[in-house]
A protein has these predicted regions:
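N-terminal Rossmann-like NAD(P)+-binding domain of SDR-like oxidoreductases, especially those catalyzing
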Residues: 1-124
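NAD(P)-dependent short-chain dehydrogenase/reductase
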Residues: 79-81, 103-169
């Protein structure tokens, strides 16, 4: 795991040089759609320009790169499962930023011969996922219940939504 602020091109380049990776799984992002409405510029800088900074830092390497886009690029799906060829119809600044990152990743693969794959999963989760997301919130609440810190009642939002969730560990 390599830490660097994607908004800092020098830090990204130094992190790549120091790690000298053979494989890169790029999951770093401002990933909360609600935040993208209040901070669209930060979302675009982190997700689009940050992805470009990372790809540019990796351009001379031979690393295999996996860029995690999002099913949010499709907007409200007309069919389930969503075919990969479905047109983009982003419904939030977050989704627009993922379209931009997706297209820039494909551009770097084609223009520079980089080995880049892009996936558009529904939800990625793991130990560093914020508790504004359902699965992280549930886990945190369960841990607090087990520790006797809160009453055994789990607060939740819409339980009708269905998601594909991939653990990134």
């Amino acid at each position: 795991l390599v830490y660097a602020d994607l908004r800092d091109g020098i830090a990204v380049r130094e992190a790549v040089e120091q790690a000298n990776p053979t494989h890169v799984f790029h999951l770093a992002a401002q990933s909360y759609p609600k935040t993208s409405f209040t901070s669209p510029l930060d979302t675009l800088d982190t997700n689009v320009q940050g992805t470009v900074r990372l790809l540019d830092a990796l351009r001379k390497s031979d690393a295999e790169i996996h860029v995690c886009s999002s099913s949010e690029v499709y907007g409200r799906a007309k069919t389930i499962p969503i075919p990969e060829e479905a047109p983009f119809h982003p419904a939030s600044p977050y989704a627009v930023s993922k379209v931009g990152a997706d297209l820039m990743a494909r551009h770097y693969a084609e223009a520079y011969g980089m080995r880049v794959q892009v996936t558009r999963m529904g939800t990625h989760t793991g130990p560093r996922r914020g508790d504004v997301f359902a699965e992280s919130s549930f886990a945190k609440q369960i841990a607090m219940i087990e520790a006797g810190q809160i009453r055994p009642i789990i607060k939740h939002g819409n339980l009708e939504s269905m998601r594909t969730i991939a653990d990134v560990r």
